[in-house]
Amino acid sequence: HVYPIAAITKDSGGETLTEMADLKLGGAVGFSDDGRPVMNARVMRLAMEIARSLRMPILAHEEDIQLSAGGVMREGAVSTRLGLRGIPAQSESTMIARDVELAELTGVHLHICHVSSVRSLKTIELAKQWRCRVTCEVTPHHLMLTDEDIAGFDARYKVNPPLGFKTDREALRVALADGLIDVIATDHAPHHQDEKRCEFEQAMFGMIGLETALPLCLSLVRDGVISLRELIRRMTIEPAKILGLAVGALAVGAIADVTLFDPNESWTVGDAPHFSRSTNTPFWGKSLTGRVKATIVGGKVVYRDGEML
């Protein structure tokens, strides 16, 4: 199933609000300007007030574009060594702090997308202590990779928010285990190969993640970071709760949306059937363990053993 998230502002420009009530009637389950932040605090406050009245969440990409302008990776020792312009962690954390304050003011449910730094986690932890309606997510690649992986100037590692330090990665894993991070989301961002096979500075941000998310996260189970039960919960039940959807759970009378997987089967990304039209992942050609065997949607088997049915 695909559930639409509607734009907060027209053309995601950050200035003029969309017809949010009409978009809800049209089937939207939340509001977001996707990979663009709403820099205007007044506009964001109004959006939150309307979303609160509609009982809809705001899903925010948190980035101060005045701090991040021109940056291509996390600012730090590695960016300095590589001669690449950095994006400070504060580009994310300062916007999270602003939106947490606005969420407390308006009472909206604020969902913070793809958290990447320990600084951001501290603000989110404080917000939850204040009992603000705040949830957050982390991507598999931020749980697996760091800025040091960019040493070879491979643009497949170029994402936004950028890969953090080892300390950020470890903090994200702890926050996931402790429940501070509510869900795991892929931030799936396909690109044509020409948009990645170029100089790092000119390459587009983003990597694909739908087909590698499960095996990557299963490595966290094997490493003792999180239990299998909790991992499944963070990828199914909890995302559904955030969006107010009556899906994601196995129960009598529930919609039969089920994924069957073998946690021990190894496969090579790219050698096995690949369904995304893009290949922009640093895991291409890597051996991963854990493979989806079948997918059931609405009680109908739509995928089995490498074939779409």
Regions found by a protein language model. Give the residues of each.
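Metal-cofactor-binding active-site regions of metalloenzymes
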Residues: H1-E15
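Fold-independent oxyanion-binding glycine-rich loops
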Residues: I5-I8, D33-G35, H61-E63, V115, ...
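His/Asp/Glu-enriched, well-ordered alpha-helical/loop segment
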Residues: R81-H109, R156, A177-I184, A189-N264
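Histidine/acidic residue-rich metal-binding segments in metalloenzymes
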Residues: E15-I184
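Glycine/Thr-rich phosphate-binding loops of Rossmann-like dinucleotide-binding domains
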Residues: A41, L121, M144, H192-D194, ...
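C-terminal cap of metal-dependent C-N hydrolases
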Residues: E199-Q202, I255-E307
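Residue-level signal for pocket-adjacent positions within structured domains
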Residues: Y3, S79-L82, V138, D154, ...
